[in-house]
From Swiss-Prot:
Cross-link Thiazole-4-carboxylic acid (Thr-Cys) placement: 30-31
A Gene Ontology BP annotation from the UniProt entry: symbiont-mediated cytolysis of host cell
Record lineage: Bacteria, Bacillati, Bacillota, Bacilli, Bacillales
InterPro entries in UniProt: Plantazolicin
Record PTM N2,N2-dimethylarginine, positions in chain: 28
Role of this protein: Peptide antibiotic inhibiting growth of Gram-positive bacteria in the dimethylated form plantazolicin A. The desmethyl form plantazolicin B has no antibiotic activity. The mode of action appears to be disruption of cell walls and lysis of cells. Inhibits B.subtilis strain HB0042, B.megaterium strain 7A1 and B.anthracis (MIC=2-4 ug/ml). Weakly inhibits Gram-positive bacteria B.brevis strain ATCC 8246, B.subtilis strain 168, B.cereus strain ATCC 14579 and strain CU1065, B.licheniformis strain ATCC 9789, M.luteus, B.sphaericus, P.granivorans and S.pyogenes (MIC=128 ug/ml).
Main location: secreted
Designated name of the protein: Plantazolicin
Crosslink position(s): 5-methyloxazole-4-carboxylic acid (Cys-Thr): 29-30, 31-32
A cellular-component GO term for this protein: Gram-positive-bacterium-type cell wall
Positions of crosslink type 5-methyloxazole-4-carboxylic acid (Thr-Thr): 32-33
Compartments in which it is found: Secreted, Cell wall
Organism listed in the record: Bacillus velezensis (strain DSM 23117 / BGSC 10A6 / LMG 26770 / FZB42)
């Protein structure tokens, strides 16, 4: 699984004003994780 390291400050700003920009990225990450987990079984 690929780990993405993001600065805490960036996370904080994203969680605030830019959350609407980050949500699609988070959803994409979640989907990728689910697909990776599913292919493991």
């Amino acid at each position: 699984m690929t780990q993405i390291k993001v600065p805490t400050a960036l996370i904080a700003s994203v969680h605030g004003e830019g959350q609407h920009l980050f949500e699609p990225m988070a959803a994409r990450c979640t989907c990728t994780t689910i697909i990776s987990s599913s292919s493991t079984f």
